[in-house]
Swiss-Prot record:
It comes from Shewanella oneidensis (strain ATCC 700550 / JCM 31522 / CIP 106686 / LMG 19005 / NCIMB 14063 / MR-1). ATP binds at G618, P619, N620, M621, G622, G623, K624, S625. Keywords: ATP-binding, DNA damage, DNA repair, DNA-binding, Nucleotide-binding. This is DNA mismatch repair protein MutS. CDD domains: ABC_MutS1. One of its GO terms (molecular function) is mismatched DNA binding. This protein is involved in the repair of mismatches in DNA. It is possible that it carries out the mismatch recognition step. This protein has a weak ATPase activity. GO terms for cellular component: cytosol. Belongs to the DNA mismatch repair MutS family. One of its GO terms (biological process) is mismatch repair. The keyword Transcription regulation does not apply. Pfam families: MutS_I (PF01624), MutS_II (PF05188), MutS_III (PF05192), MutS_IV (PF05190), MutS_V (PF00488).
Length: 856
């Protein structure tokens, strides 16, 4: 049966009717339906949960004549199961009992109180501590795309107008959202295939006017001019859908989402999806974090600092003034050694950014308030450390940290030193904060003393030495007497419970005290919950300032981390130049040097207006790809304000970094290895400029030798002569080493190797000039190719080389070989090009068809 079909509800039991009605409202997610100490799932939800979570699938009787598939999880273990589900892109609606079973005549009243989706998480138990948790929405217009992202756990809201599908792919790669909303007629679904949390939304949720109203209501403004986004129509439509989705799932006010910013590609160095992937910035080719640039650079003290660092890595700046502000701050931190004390102070700060989001949503827990209290108490120490610094950017961050003495004092006075995890059982509000609460607690907590006194008094009054006064949750307070002595009890003793050898009684005095104590416990809990809610009201007026504090602390963390990395790893401050070029002396690959078992060989690179392309040759395993990647990574690091692994680096303006490195099939899109290679090459040739850094590795190897050589030659020639991009062009086509003789600005460099008998040693040092040979057979032998195969390959190689020598005298120069004649155009095609269909009569059109037939 389909649990969403509510047409025949009368066939079912009252409880199942209640369930089916709620499921119909949340048909696109799993429904956790609270029954006692369990959350139950039914029908298809039960089957899916059983499969995804590995829990037992059972049946719960029948409803409507059919067995009901059922699966359940204990309520106290729900967070662990939720974590598993959101990691695989599932959403869950949590339905709680809000009525009293004792007074309910039919099914207990229930209500969906919480919706958990991958992109709207704020609970720290469900979040990846050092990764942004982005919800995204994408909308396709007639021309271009609108893209919006929101991190509900921080309040960061960003939009982008993207002109091409390739730009959208790059943004998806950069932001890596955990949940994506897209419209019903979205035409680029192939870009979303590997994302888990995809949600198709109705077209009306992207309505422009509705979106504007939603955003204005959220920000409390009359218009959006102050955000500089009024012309971003498509991305505002995406933002509106996103905002509505968050309101529907959170079901509460969202005061921490108080601004929206626009991401402009012109402000940052453009990195397309292939470049981000090939350079392994924050994710390696296997999908993990090991051996990435982020893994090397990230020694941040806080999780919020780590997340900011990863955003910086994916958004290298173009504005030299902004970069220099960061560099100056890092340099001062390093020279004064203040980064050491800052690191320790920030480590104790915690993840204030996410704590503030939970506070804004009123889902913060007692320990969140305790952590906020600790963070505020550290502010004077932080400010003292910063007082030693004078760099303008650092001074500005110090001002943003702010001061919050009243809020700190409030939390010191209100919250106990080590609060419990949850408010529901009490014990969170400190004694002395509220006199009425202390009074109710005193009544409750004084029960033990009262019972001891009552027991002593009753023993003396009755003469029953074995008399005891006790309490249990079922029967409450009682006076216990052995059955043998029960005939000695006074007349005011009323029997409450009979046991095998004991009788339990209650007296009017004890009954009255019981009611008073139980009432005081309930009143104490209710008052404590009220005081807890009031704490939110007292802190929230400072929400914006506390968010500024969190952002400033995160940036200080990143900058002090850069200083520590520079000191520990031997990095130097790069020089930024206004002249186009990249000059690196003794550069090192930041990742490879950390994982290599042998000393890393540093290498230089020089690119400028008169030296725009390097043809890089050398053996496989010789280090060509490592060399090219290190140039790109050093350039990128310089543009995020980080010091770089080199003795010296001077880098001019860069608008884009392109890489065509490595090869793999794209099976999901039906593209072969060669097709992927050519698509990436086409993107580079179309979009590279004279200020771009281009890395091209082994172009043309996925097809026949002459096809591949022709493509590689033409691509290199186009980049050198038409585009003028700064290019490293690695190849095994030795014919390409003739390019420097044919055009200016092109130079050969190579990585060499030394042969000794049947072994080979790679030098990994870059030298001017072309390589002498490729050493392919030696590398194959190192890889373990059978000796018989290597021997046969050597024999075949000698045959081929001998044949080449025999025709040496008639050998055609490569430029002549590649200068193929232009194909002659078919006369029918020429005729078609000359036709103007608007000027033809029907008779002329028919005559023309016969003529075209003859010409073809």
């Amino acid at each position: 049966m389909n649990p969403i079909d509510t047409d025949d509800l009368e066939k079912h039991t009252p409880m199942m009717r209640q369930y089916l009605s709620m499921k119909a409202e949340h048909h696109d997610m799993l429904l956790f339906y609270r029954m006692g100490d369990f959350y139950e799932l039914f029908y298809d939800d039960a089957k899916r949960a059983s499969e995804l979570l590995g829990i037992s699938l059972t049946a719960r009787g029948k409803s409507g004549g059919d067995p009901i598939p059922m699966a359940g999880i204990p309520y106290h273990a729900v967070e662990g199961y939720l974590a598993k589900l959101v990691q695989i892109g599932q959403s869950v609606a949590i339905c709680e009992q809000i009525g009293d079973p004792a007074t309910s005549k039919g099914p207990v009243e229930r209500k969906v109180v919480r919706i958990v989706t991958p992109g709207t998480l704020t609970d720290e138990a469900l979040l990846q501590e050092r990764q942004d948790n982005l919800l995204a929405a994408v909308y396709q217009g007639k021309v271009g795309f609108g893209y919006a992202t929101l991190d509900v756990s921080s309040g960061r809201f960003v939009i982008a107008e993207l002109e091409t599908k390739e730009s959208l792919e790059a943004e998806l790669q950069r932001t890596n959202p955990v949940e994506i909303l897209y419209s019903e007629d979205f035409g680029a679904l192939d870009l979303l295939h590997h994302f888990k949390g995809k949600r198709r939304r109705p077209e009306w949720e992207f309505d422009y006017d509705t979106s504007i109203k939603l955003l204005l209501a959220q920000f409390g403004t009359k218009d959006l001019h102050g955000f500089g986004i009024t012309d971003a129509r498509l991305s505002l439509q995406a933002a509106g859908c996103l905002m509505q989705y968050v309101k529907d799932t959170q079901r509460t006010a969202l005061p921490h989402i108080n601004a929206i910013t626009r991401f402009n590609q012109t402000d940052t160095i453009v990195l397309d999806a292939a470049t981000r992937r090939n350079l392994e910035l924050t994710q390696n080719l296997s999908g993990g974090r090991d051996n990435t640039l982020a893994a090397v650079l990230d020694n941040t003290a806080t999780a919020m600092g780590s997340r900011m660092l990863q955003r910086w890595i994916h958004q290298p700046l173009r504005d030299h003034a902004l970069i220099l502000a960061r560099q100056t701050a890092v340099n001062e931190l390093l020279e004064t050694a203040v980064h050491e004390s800052l690191h320790e102070q920030l480590k104790a700060l915690g993840d204030i950014e996410r704590i503030m989001a939970r506070l804004a949503l009123r889902t913060a827990r007692p320990r969140d308030f305790a952590r906020l209290r600790q963070a505020l108490s550290l502010l004077p120490q932080l400010q003292l450390s910063l007082s030693q610094l004078s760099a303008p950017h650092t001074v500005k961050l110090g001002q943003l940290l702010g001061e919050f003495p009243q809020e700190q004092q409030l939390l010191e006075h209100a919250i106990v030193d080590n609060p419990p995890m949850l408010i529901r059982d009490g014990g969170v509000i400190r004694e002395g904060y509220n006199a009425e609460l202390d009074e109710w607690r005193g009544l409750s907590e004084g029960a033990s003393d009262y019972l001891v006194q009552l027991e002593a008094r009753e023993k003396e009054r009755t003469g029953i030495a074995t008399l005891k006064v006790g309490y249990n949750r079922v029967h409450g307070y009682y006076i216990e007497v052995s059955r043998l002595q029960s005939n000695q009890v006074p007349l005011n003793y009323q029997r409450r419970q009979t046991l095998k050898n004991m009788e339990r009684y209650i007296t009017p005095e004890l009954k009255e005290y019981e009611e008073k104590v139980l009432s005081s416990q309930g009143k104490a809990l209710a008052l404590e919950k009220q005081l807890w809610d009031e704490l939110f009201d007292l802190i929230l007026p400072k929400l914006h300032e506390l968010q500024d504090f969190a952002r400033a602390a995160a940036e200080l963390d990143v900058l002090s981390n850069f200083a520590e990395r520079a000191e520990t790893l031997g990095y130097t401050s790069p020089e930024l130049s206004s002249e186009i070029g990249v000059k690196i002396e003794a550069g090192r690959h930041p990742v490879v040097e950390r994982v290599s078992q042998t000393p890393f060989i540093a290498n230089p690179v020089t690119l400028h207006n008169q030296r725009r392309m390097l043809i890089v040759t050398g053996p496989n395993m010789g280090g060509k790809s490592t060399y090219m990647r290190q140039v790109a990574l050093i350039t990128l690091m310089a543009h995020i304000g980080c010091f770089v692994p080199a003795e010296r680096a001077t880098i001019g303006p860069i608008d884009r970094i392109f890489t065509r490195i490595g090869a793999s099939d794209d099976l999901a899109s039906g593209r072969s290895t060669f097709m992927v290679e050519m698509t990436e090459t086409a993107n580079i040739l179309h979009n590279a400029t004279a200020q771009s850094l281009v890395l091209m590795d082994e172009i043309g190897r996925g097809t026949s030798t002459y096809d591949g050589l022709s493509l590689a030659w033409s691509a290199a020639e186009y980049l050198a002569q038409q585009v003028g991009a700064m290019t490293l062009f690695a190849t095994h086509y030795f014919e390409l080493t003739q390019l420097p003789e044919l055009m200016s600005g092109v130079y050969n460099v190579h990585l060499d190797a030394i042969e000794h008998e049947d072994t080979i040693a790679f030098m990994h040092a870059v030298q001017e000039g072309a390589a002498s040979k490729s050493y392919g057979l030696q590398v194959a032998a190192l890889a373990g190719v059978p000796a018989r195969v290597i021997k046969a390959a050597k024999h075949k190689l000698h045959q081929l080389e001998s044949r080449d020598h025999q025709v040496e005298g008639t050998k055609t120069p490569i430029q002549t070989l590649l200068a193929l004649p232009e194909p002659v155009e078919n006369p029918a095609v020429s005729k078609l090009k000359a036709i103007n269909p608007d000027n033809l009569t029907p008779k002329q059109a028919l005559d023309l068809l016969y003529e075209l037939k003859r010409l073809s």
